[in-house]
Amino acid sequence: MADEEKVTTEEQALADEWAAALAEAGDASQDDIDALMAQGGATPVAEPSTPRAPMEEFGASPKAPTISGLEGPNLDVILDIPVTISMEVGHTDISIRNLLQLNQGSVIELDRLAGEPLDVLVNGTLIAHGEVVVVNEKFGIRLTDVISPSERIKKLR
């Protein structure tokens, strides 16, 4: 019985809220308010008045604006972007104490043996290995092993 009183009280409160809202709107008559109270505040849900768009209007292929003359990606745009290429002979970790003690003539031992190939890095990403050569009295590098594009992409992830 307590549950019935609770439901009735909730329905009455909902009906009172609707009546107050309709009274504020000013276009509600007393008959409308009485009808809402008689229904217990339950009002039928009205269907939306706007019709739904048929699914065939939303085709599977999007119709993006096209620029004339560009069928695929234009890779020429990125071919002139400068990149930094560097060769790494080797590396090592030292403490700041040892770093501060370095001076002219100090020797730093690296992790690679003499004659081992160098790492060729483009913007910090390893792309190849090579050996040092001299070209017109300048250092150069002869590539001995180039990493495949798929392996380079894997390293980026």
UniProtKB/Swiss-Prot annotation:
Cross-referenced PANTHER family, in alphabetical order? FLAGELLAR MOTOR SWITCH PROTEIN FLIN (PTHR43484:SF1), PTHR43484
Pfam families in the record: FliMN_C
User: What is the annotated localization of this protein?
Assistant: Cell inner membrane; Bacterial flagellum basal body
Lineage runs: Bacteria, Pseudomonadati, Pseudomonadota, Gammaproteobacteria, Pseudomonadales
**Protein's UniProt keywords contain Cell inner membrane:** yes
Topology in membrane: Peripheral membrane protein
Q: What is this protein called?
A: Flagellar motor switch protein FliN
This protein's record includes keyword Cell inner membrane: yes
- What family name appears in the similarity comment? Belongs to the FliN/MopA/SpaO family.
Gene Ontology terms: biological process: bacterial-type flagellum-dependent cell motility; chemotaxis
The segments labelled Disordered in the record are: 24-67
> What is a single cellular component term in the Gene Ontology annotation?
plasma membrane
Q: Which UniProt keywords apply?
A: Bacterial flagellum, Cell inner membrane, Cell membrane, Chemotaxis, Flagellar rotation, Membrane
Q: What does this protein do?
A: FliN is one of three proteins (FliG, FliN, FliM) that form the rotor-mounted switch complex (C ring), located at the base of the basal body. This complex interacts with the CheY and CheZ chemotaxis proteins, in addition to contacting components of the motor that determine the direction of flagellar rotation.
Task: State the Gene Ontology terms under molecular function.
Answer: cytoskeletal motor activity
Organism listed in the record: Pseudomonas aeruginosa (strain ATCC 15692 / DSM 22644 / CIP 104116 / JCM 14847 / LMG 12228 / 1C / PRS 101 / PAO1)
